[in-house]
Amino acid sequence: MQEKMIDILGSETEIPKKIEGWNHTFQLAKPYIKVNGIGIDVGCREGGFAREMENNFTHIHCFDFRNKKNMFEKNVIDMSKFTYHVCGIGDKEGTTFTTSHAVGRIKDRGDVAVPIKTIDSFDLQNVTFIKYDIEGYELKAIQGSEKTIKKYNPVIVVEQNKGNIYAQELLESWGYKCKGIDKIFNQDYIMVKE
């Protein structure tokens, strides 16, 4: 397999920690994931986590409201395994706003328009894994993925920051259980349907 140097944003000390964190989180989730399925990366940024997923799914759909596709293409080995969608993922279709494309946080305020879609609107089949890392928008994104989640019961990695566990609580109400929390960043929860 061809090796590539990963091109991600961050300082010389941050980049190795990010790569270690993505790998650690995916390795925690991997034993629970069914093989030969579709993966979804919500909040894919420049492709660091997606690269960890690359050899484990038949296809991977990646979502980010900031168009970082050029960097993304440099970071994965085989772009034909990916579909890169430039949109935010939320609980309903429409437009919301943020203050800047430089920051990956949808704030529902500001003057930068962000198109929002739901995962359910894509009607993806055989979804076996979803990662949500969208800086506080996880609950809305999961609400917009309800049909997909309830149909396929994918393994879910969800970032939960600053004591906000609403997304985890929603998943638990749907029969999911937390099987682990990454020990690198202590904010990525591995959720598996019981």
Regions found by a protein language model. Give the residues of each.
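Phosphate/nucleotide-binding beta-alpha loop and adjacent structural elements of enzyme active sites
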Residues: 1-194
